Amino acid sequence: MDKLRIMTNNVWSCGSNKPWWIERGLDCSSQARAPKFAPLYKETMPDLIGWQEGDKHFRTLVLPEMKNLGMNYDMIEGGDTSILYNKDSLELLESYFEEYPETIPEYEGKFNNNNTKSFCIGVFKTKESGKLLAFASTHLWWMSGNPIHSHYQPNSNEAREYQINMLLDKLEKIREKYNCPAIAVGDFNAEYDSLAVKATFDRGYRHAHDIAVEYADERDGYHFCFPDGYKPYKNPKPFVEGIDHIVIKGEPDGFVRRFERYTPDYYMPLSDHFPAWIDVEI
């Protein structure tokens, strides 16, 4: 029985320091923040990490720091949605990367800002027992589909639904090819009761939170951390308002043991999204 920890982590793409931070002697630039993710990963030791907003500069800063800490990890280069994996526990068999199109058929508007919305897939074999696993990291369109929201753009909900189905089309082919469980993680920019999440359910996927055997975190895992400042994570919203998701298909019984959001104080100025992970047995 292999035990794996699988994480999704939006690391916040913010390349330069901003006035609010400078005035307080702080630094929110990627140059300052990126190295601080390596100790986080050393502390938690995920076997797989699906990134969002991990741009090229950020990627070049984190992996060397992880190696300095004695961590034997490698990366599937997948744009802002790259995948990191533990080479001590996993062997990479196949990978795939695709950017979502800027436009969506039948819907007016553009739905990919600076080519940051994409998905990356890796197929892995566990080194302990040779079990197979397909893993995908994605970041869906960010603007709101709610007309009263300050960042409203018409058809945004439908765009996210279209994008997640693009990912699942590819992931399903890979899952069937290898006859293995498939896990999709990422920043959906959509809550539990959304078209995007429901689209995964309609295709036979289940949310890790809903099938966790031992523990399921009931917090949303999102807080205020932006160019104009950051705040402590107080009075978290409920799970159903979270936008970072982990969905699974083809898993054996009891596969997901725990679903957790990791919210240490030192992480508050690193990103608006707290890491979420699952502990699985395969």
Give, region by region, the residue ranges found by the protein language model.
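Acidic/histidine-rich helix-loop elements
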Residues: 8-33, 100-112, 141-159
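Active-site environment of divalent metal-dependent phosphoester hydrolases
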Residues: 13-16, 56-60, 142-146, 189-197, ...
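Short, Asp-centered acidic motifs that coordinate Mg2+ and/or phosphate
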Residues: 4, 47-48, 133, 181-183, ...
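His/acidic metal-ligating clusters that form di-metal
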Residues: 118-138, 149-190, 197
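N-terminal, active-site-proximal structural segment of metallo-dependent hydrolase catalytic domains
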Residues: 1-65, 165, 282
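Metal-dependent phosphoester-hydrolase catalytic domains
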Residues: 169-183, 189-282
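Active-site metal-binding loops of divalent metal-dependent hydrolases
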Residues: 10-11, 138-140, 187-188, 274
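Structured beta-strand-rich core segments of catalytic domains in phosphoester-bond hydrolases
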Residues: 48-142, 260
